[in-house]
């Protein structure tokens, strides 16, 4: 008597795990926020190239406020990425500083909005204090960039490029005093393209 054993046919309706099939899924959790930062930086750069860094008249002010406001929203998105990824560190002080920067930036966005609709009055102390939130927020981002580099939690270009991007205030503001609003507008626009626009792409491609 002969016994013949026939193996069961392989099932074809079961999907193999990604590791077994040799394929992996790329996750980019910060993609949308990175692209928003790039779009905002480029929009503000274009607006600054057209109207300069010191707009005059209702139309120029409205255009400038719109594009700079888009940039500010992009930076606000960047702050959420930094908070989520603990880019400054895991301690309470790092979280507090990011929250404080977000509050100052939201006041700066409010300042941009009221400038755009033409209701601000810089001759009054309250409006002046609100207007100061804009440069203060940018200086805060500069210190955040330094802290990211020191903490070393982000790797590669993402560790050091924030310092480049967030040095916008320390580069562009002095150029306004030295060369006037026209030259400062082009300096600021170029810095936005090299700094924040590129940083947005780096953030968009981060996988963790």
Please provide the spans of the model-predicted regions.
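Hydrophobic, aromatic-enriched alpha-helical segments typical of multi-pass transmembrane helices
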Residues: 2-208
């Amino acid at each position: 008597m002969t016994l013949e054993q026939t193996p069961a046919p392989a099932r074809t309706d079961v999907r193999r795990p990604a590791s077994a099939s040799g394929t992996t899924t790329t996750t980019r959790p910060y993609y949308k926020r990175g692209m928003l930062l790039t779009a905002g930086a480029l929009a503000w750069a274009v607006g600054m190239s057209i109207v300069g860094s010191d707009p005059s008249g209702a139309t120029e002010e409205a255009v400038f406020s719109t594009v700079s406001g888009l940039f500010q929203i992009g930076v606000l998105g960047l702050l959420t990425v930094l908070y989520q990824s603990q880019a400054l560190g895991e301690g309470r002080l790092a979280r507090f500083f990011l929250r404080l920067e977000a509050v100052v930036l939201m006041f700066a966005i409010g300042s941009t909005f009221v400038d755009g609709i033409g209701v601000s009055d810089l001759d009054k102390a309250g409006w002046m204090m609100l207007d100061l939130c804009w440069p203060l927020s940018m200086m805060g981002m500069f210190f955040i960039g330094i802290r990211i580099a020191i903490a070393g939690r982000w790797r590669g270009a993402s560790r050091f490029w924030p310092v480049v991007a967030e040095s916008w205030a320390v580069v562009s503001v002095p150029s306004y005093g030295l060369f006037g609003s026209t030259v400062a507008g082009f300096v600021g626009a170029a810095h936005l393209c090299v700094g924040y626009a590129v940083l947005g792409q780096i953030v968009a491609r981060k996988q963790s």
